[in-house]
Amino acid sequence: MHIEGRNAVKEAILSGATIEKVMASNSAKDATFEEIVRLAKSKKLKIQFVDNGLLNKTSQTGKHQGLIAVTTEFKYSTVSEILNVSRSNNKDAFILILDGIEDPHNLGSIIRVCECFGVDGIIIGKNRACSVNETVIKTSAGATSYVKIAKVTNINQTIEDLKKNNVWVYGCELGGEDINSVDYSGDCAVVIGSEGFGTSKLTLKLCDKIVTIPMCGKVNSLNASVATGIAINTIYTKKNR
C-alpha cells in the first residue's frame, strides 16, 4: 500500500507505521519537504530519491506532493480493541458506525473529523462499503495513523454486541429527535448511513434512539462526511460540557 502526500506521510512516520521505504522527489527543495525527509532519516527509514515521472506512475491518487511512503497493507483493529481505548483511559466510549459509505473521499474526511474530536474508533462493513485505500489515507491527512478502524462482516450483529456491552447506539437519520436536545453521557455509538440510501431500516430498528440534524434549507439532505462532522462535533461538545 502507498501513503501519499506530505501530511499523510509525515503522520505515518510519526505514528511508527511499518514503512518499507519513502520515495521522495529529487527536485523538491522547500522547507516542508526537507523537514519530512529529515524526519524519515531520523527514523532510519530507507529514502529513495526519484524523478517526478516515476512518482506520477507510482501514485494511486495523482496527488503525491513529492512524497510516497511504501507500507504494508492497512492494519484493521477489532471492535474489542476500539472498546479498550475508553476502558484503558477510564472514559466513556465514543464510537462511529458507518453503514455503507462507498466514496473514499468521504471516508477519508470522516476519519479526519473523528481524529479531531476524540472518537475512539470507526466500524465499517466488509460488503458494499469502501475499505481503507490510498485515496482514503491521503484524504484523511494522516488521521488513519491514529484512529482505530474495524471492518466487520455484519454491522447489525456488531450493534447488538455493542449494546450487550452497555453502549447506547444512536442512528443519525431524518425523523428523529433533535440531535442537540439529547443527553449523550455514558458509552455511545452513532450510526451514519450511506451517501445514496441512508441507514438501512433494520439497522435503524436496532438503534436505541434516532437523532436528526435540524436544517432550515430547501435541500433536506447532507453529504455523508458533512453530516458526520456535525453529528460528531455535537456529541463531542455535549459530552465535554
Residue ranges and their predicted role:
Residues 48, 122-125, 212:
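Short hydrophobic alpha-helical runs that function as membrane-insertion/retention elements
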Residues 137-143, 201, 205-241:
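Structured adenosyl-cofactor binding patch, chiefly the S-adenosyl-L-methionine
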Residues 1-85:
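N-terminal positively charged helical leader segments and presequences
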Residues 170-223:
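Active-site/ligand-binding-proximal alpha/beta "capping" segment
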Residues 41, 159-163, 236:
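Surface-exposed amphipathic alpha-helices with a cationic face
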Residues 11-17, 84-177:
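RNA substrate-binding interface of SAM-dependent RNA methyltransferases
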